[in-house]
Amino acid sequence: MKLIYTEMSYSMTEILVNEARKAADQGYRVFYIAPNSLSFEKEREVLTLLPERGTFSIIVTRFVQMSRYFTVESSPSKQHLDDTTLAMIFYRTLMQLKPEDLPSYGRLQNNSVFIEQLVELYKELKNAQLSVHDLTGLDHPQKQEDLIKIIELAETIMIQQDYNQDSPLQSFARAIKLGLLNNQLSKTVVVIDGFSRFSAEEDYLLSLLNNNCQEVIIGSYVSQKAYQKSFIKGNIYEASLHFLQDLAQKYHIKPVFATSNQVFKPAFSRLTQLFEATHDFSQVDWQLQKNDLDHFSLWQCHHQKEEIEHVAKSIRQKLYEGYRYKDILVLLGDMDAYQLQIGPIFDKFEIPYYLGKAEPMAAHPLVQFIESLERSQRYNWRREDILNMLKSGLFGCFDDSDIDRFEEYTQFADIKGFTKFSKPFTINSSRQYPLDFLNEMRQDIVLPLQELFKSQKQLGASLVDKLILFLKKIRLAENMQGLAQSQLEVEKNEEVWKRFTDILTSFHHIFGQEKLRLSDCLALIKTGMKSAQYRVVPATLDVVTIKSYDLVQPHSKPFVYAIGLTQSHFPKQIHHSGLLSDQERARINEIRNYRHFDIASAENSKKNHQTALSLFNAATKELVLSVPTVINETFDDLSPYLKELINFGLPLLDKGKNYLSYDNSDIANYKALLSQIIAINRQDLIEMSDQDKMFWTVVLRYLRKQLRKQQLELPTSDYRLSTKPLSKEVIEVCFPKGIPLKLSATALTVFYNNQYNYFLKYVLNLNKTESIHPDSRIHGQYLHRVFERLMKDHTQEPFDNKLKQAIYHTNQESFFQQVYQDNAEAEYSLAILEDIVRSTAPILQLNQNIQVIDQEKNFQLDMGNEILVHGIIDRIDQLSDGSLGIVDYKSSANQFDIGTFYNGLSPQLVTYLAALKQIAPHDINQLFGAMYLHLQDPKLDLVTFKQIDNTLVESIYKALTYKGIFSEVEKEHLSTGAYQTKNALYSNDELETLLNYNKYLYLKAAKHIKKGHFLINPYTSDGKTVQGDQLKAITRFEADLDMGQARRLVTLPAKEKKECFLTLMRKESHL
């Protein structure tokens, strides 16, 4: 064995490549070993250093891959054992054990986290060269007994199922120990680079290689100063020194110092020496030179997004200077926090990148499909799960529009559960859903699912066969092929599909002869899919590499950006969580000399020093270290390592907000520039110098020219909401000439509430989602129907009997039976409505001097000028003197207000009066009024009553009165009824004014509607708050920003309010 160490200013890779070349020139086969996370980059670096740029004699690989070169032909043809397969084996193991068999872990048998911890422990035991019987000295002896039972039974299952329990390194070591590879290894040289420690498994293999290979060469970075130190605790080279010292002591060899031809910039060397002096308690009498600072930058940004954008702009600048993407490395302090944001921002700046981390499969449509399938079975056909299966695009041959229609209907009819999905859809609504088509679609969905879900407990092999048959029926494989829209997606889908088939194969192999329920089968497959990961190789090598900062090696790239280096992430504090505590691992390690657990928390300090040292020397030309003040929406402090750099004299640059400028880094990329122009267009105006204004004027002129070529336009500012008028063609279709414009009192109210709301409801015909569950609209229909029946009953039966009959027959109508007998909640609503009917009905019994002459009367009121107003009058009453009036039932409190009417927000009663005047018989000229009847169950506060007497009854009936517009002429006839006439009496001339102004409101609205230009103008009564429908989700209206667009209502003081509004009405309607 040969041990080599060198200073950070030299290239260890070059030194080891030279050693490898010498061995290769002598005819030896050389394996150049790198850590798993660095083998790809190390291979490119090694091949670059070879003069011939490639050779068959030197193989750059990993320990595991190296073992396959020697054992691929002699290895037994056993099943491969991966993490998912291990989890299934442990699940089967726990199925065969009873809770009483496991005193410590019996309650965790079905816990997925516990199974994951068992998998991790089993892998750790293999890496540590330990067996479960070596787990002595645990806190509770019962733990070892339980673990022995579980793992021994699991290993028995592995043997029965012909799984290979040995790792590749164990198989390699066994072959060497048996002397099967002596001839090959005698002609082999092993070169090891990038390690600062070995696992027990690697350590054992290394001892065998040292005895059988021609030579083993190991290199590591250690300064000569550190190597000569006797006390190394806290030294930045502590990990490497322990590594070399342990090897030197074990193999009785002295490490040698070597140098490379390549010497890196002295600025990095001087920074390393300052860093070393800080931690070995020595002193230096010099500081960083001014030109050294050109190679380092310390950035501070407000949050992650700004930080990534500054990095992206800097990368674009490097490209402008002539460098390549492959010259740049981006390191992340927190991979999870940055992974979702860095991709879209780099795409915006058109920076190709490769994220050096396996992607989880959890977000793939196939995984979502499997999860929805499992949940559908477990939760009895829940609607959300069925729809998620369809939306994955992998179930059957349904268009998106068909799925949307199916979803709309199932939400309307509240279809959920197997019972409702299995029955034909019969309920319809005013929208007239295509029930025949929906039922055909329902059958295509239900039949294959029903066939699968009815599977009883049976052998796992049979369940897999039925699952595969189901997947064939729904054309899963064909649909999977149709998902991909790019070559990258094709590669991802192939990886996911391969993983899926591997999981099915493992399940069939392990549980084929075990009896399982379908729910357990689907849950196991789902768990395996959700925990699986895949990795896609970049299509080109010229990309920016992105990875976690703790995987970096010295001298990786010319330019390195390390971001997210906050106190919480730099240094990283690793704490192990599993079935064994660190204290238990330490006690086991004390007993076993060469077989040991890795205890991450015990090595945090020296590992973090080693990582910081590698990071500070990761670049060969320029190193940028950045820290956000807010990460994951949490404030964080500077890393202690960065504070040391500041003490060395490196300035901390506050990058601030990502303002646009006319620097090359801001304007060199068209896509990024366009996105930032849009961002500026949405912001408040900022102060600009004359030079800035001139520059951006020219840039905008150029951009608009380019956008016009692509038929694009810049969006308008959010703070100036405007709408475009409809085209002439659309106006002719929506409002054809010669056909009257149809309006109603409700439509007019919507128009004056917010014109854009009228456009949505009555031009685009957009409606809210319907539901079979009773709402205020259906409640109103029910109440109307009961009172209609009651008022039509002219028999001599007592009033209470009539009321009971009206309620009974209304409840028997098929529509109301479907609505109110569907569930307990609906039945409760019906009970409340019946109480309201019983409470309101007495008012009809009291008014014996009126006669109901018509109910639910449809009308069409010709307003002239091609306007037709339509509606339904709930009830037409006639007083004893022959005068007519209308009643409108309301489920909420309503009262006529002349100011609200003047502003167009309450035209209903006056419109009905106009309609009644038109349809009334010719011999009847007098109208006594139009009124609301609030259908309610009056609530009284008994605390306000001193005693229960007639005043209580009077208060109840006082709440049950007609409120609205009444004729002053009919005052005497109204005084004996339940009419609230105070401040509600109008003379005939005043009533005529109301009718004429009502016509004016319709004509004014119709004229505006026919122009086809609808404003976003919800009304405001005080100019401070907006009461109209703002439609924020559609219009993005904000009261504090867009108050100027709101329609201000005309308000007058209460004194002489009626007379003033009538005067205004006469003026505006030209009376």
Curated annotation (Swiss-Prot):
Q: List the disulfide bonds.
A: none
Q: Which cofactor does it need?
A: Mg(2+)
Oligomeric state and interaction partners are given as:
Heterodimer of AddA and RexB.
Name of encoding gene: rexB
Question: Coiled-coil intervals in this record?
Answer: none
Role summary? The heterodimer acts as both an ATP-dependent DNA helicase and an ATP-dependent, dual-direction single-stranded exonuclease. Recognizes the chi site generating a DNA molecule suitable for the initiation of homologous recombination. This subunit has 5' -> 3' nuclease activity but not helicase activity.
Q: Which domain of life is it from?
A: Bacteria
**For this chain's UniProt record, which GO biological process terms are given?**
double-strand break repair via homologous recombination
User: EC number(s) for this protein?
Assistant: 3.1.-.-
Protein name as annotated: ATP-dependent helicase/deoxyribonuclease subunit B
Its top-level enzyme class, in one word, is hydrolase
- List other remarks: Despite having helicase-like domains, this subunit does not have helicase activity.
Task: Note the SUPFAM superfamilies from the entry.
Answer: P-loop containing nucleoside triphosphate hydrolases, Restriction endonuclease-like
Q: From the UniProt record, which GO molecular function terms apply?
A: 5'-3' exonuclease activity; ATP binding; double-stranded DNA binding; helicase activity; hydrolase activity, acting on acid anhydrides
